[in-house]
Amino acid sequence: MMEVESSYSDFISCDRTGRRNAVPDIQGDSEAVSVRKLAGDMGELALEGAEGQAEGGTPDKEASNQPQSSDGTTSS
């Protein structure tokens, strides 16, 4: 119970108020990840996703271009 009371008093004494800001300050953890590393990781994800779509996406793309009637069948 003492742990809750001490964290409550720490929160009340800081300058962060309101619902949106009612979370602990996590800037210490965010400094461990660099923006350059994050951008590199995101670039790798985008490339892998684009390669997968180029290989297997062509037949699905052609099928999706065919108009469908109201009963769900494709018309030719």
Swiss-Prot record:
<dbReference type="GO" id="GO:0042308">
    <property type="term" value="P:negative regulation of protein import into nucleus"/>
</dbReference>
<keyword id="KW-0649">Protein kinase inhibitor</keyword>
<feature type="compositionally biased region" description="Low complexity">
    <location>
        <begin position="47"/>
        <end position="57"/>
    </location>
</feature>
<dbReference type="Pfam" id="PF02827">
    <property type="entry name" value="PKI"/>
</dbReference>
<dbReference type="GO" id="GO:0005737">
    <property type="term" value="C:cytoplasm"/>
</dbReference>
<dbReference type="InterPro" id="IPR004171">
    <property type="entry name" value="cAMP_dep_PKI"/>
</dbReference>
<feature type="region of interest" description="Disordered">
    <location>
        <begin position="47"/>
        <end position="76"/>
    </location>
</feature>
<dbReference type="GO" id="GO:0004862">
    <property type="term" value="F:cAMP-dependent protein kinase inhibitor activity"/>
</dbReference>
<dbReference type="GO" id="GO:0000122">
    <property type="term" value="P:negative regulation of transcription by RNA polymerase II"/>
</dbReference>
<feature type="compositionally biased region" description="Polar residues">
    <location>
        <begin position="64"/>
        <end position="76"/>
    </location>
</feature>
<comment type="similarity">
    <text>Belongs to the PKI family.</text>
</comment>
<feature type="compositionally biased region" description="Polar residues">
    <location>
        <begin position="1"/>
        <end position="10"/>
    </location>
</feature>
<dbReference type="GO" id="GO:0005634">
    <property type="term" value="C:nucleus"/>
</dbReference>
<feature type="region of interest" description="Disordered">
    <location>
        <begin position="1"/>
        <end position="25"/>
    </location>
</feature>
<protein>
    <recommendedName>
        <fullName>cAMP-dependent protein kinase inhibitor gamma</fullName>
    </recommendedName>
</protein>
<comment type="function">
    <text>Extremely potent competitive inhibitor of cAMP-dependent protein kinase activity, this protein interacts with the catalytic subunit of the enzyme after the cAMP-induced dissociation of its regulatory chains.</text>
</comment>
